[in-house]
């Protein structure tokens, strides 16, 4: 009986000490944030808060918000940006949650007269996942070849940071990274921090990193969120439910190669093939989000295409070289198959969720790259129109093209094979209107001519 009493007494004491210690830590961090904001050697450099909608960045933003409320913002008008990067292939369930949260943040900041502005960054059209994978034939990423991280995550945010540095001279990036999150995260923080200083230099010139909650434990973080509703309104109930259903952490704002990308059970891109299994998607499906099953099936197919290059990829690389064990881009018919599966998945989930997986602009650029790779037999619009009832026409001059085709047939009566060649060359020429840079067009035309000569079994003459 005495031992039971002592155990209960000990547990209560531990909980009291933990709660008291956490409250002291929170107060200390808030005071530190206020001090950094007010007494910075450069009071004009903006704060850029990396926000992913997950638990770490949510706590960071909430603490900064509460600190700013204690400052006379009429006197101190340092701009604060809440930057959220959308790769355009994020887990759709997370996208819906984040979009609503960002809307609440901006509305509340305006009402509370806080100099906070929400900014959403996205990759350039030519850098999107589908343009590179389906258009150019880039293989699904793995841990050794993560071509997606720079294009989808680092570059969009970097462009915004550089814009602010160009305008203000310097910028401070606030991140929700924590040592307790993982061993690799702890090692990264320790490796880059400067002892005795709050800020560390970022890889970008005139940019600095500030991680106010780096020493907060995960248990304390959840306790804080459970006890303190977000100052922008509502509760953290939806956030907690997401974690409960997906059993994972959140993706950090990736600003350089030292920041770990998402994997294991973390929320991230639904197309991510860096890991074998997407545990967060599996868990969401198991917890009632069955509409995500088509996405899971497509992701698993991408893993298959990556793991069996001898089936799905060209032997020859883009530079024309061939080497044992070194594979080229996806075969053209494989790219068409991936697009077909993607559009079928989009049609299926749009019936219940209304989510768009690929944009019209991306499909136009994919067609451009297919033309450049001399893939003319199958067109993007043909694949789309077989799946959807609302047809798309990528050629506003379709009637003109038909007239051109008839004229070509008449002109090439004696050499009917030349009709296809000339049509392909015209298609290549027309695609240049899609891109600002026309570099490589002459090489594309030369490649098509050489391909035609090879089909006729004639000797190929290289310049």
Language-model-detected regions and their locations in the chain:
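Nucleotide-activated chemistry modules centered on ATP-dependent adenylation/adenylyltransferase
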Residues: 2-48, 55-463
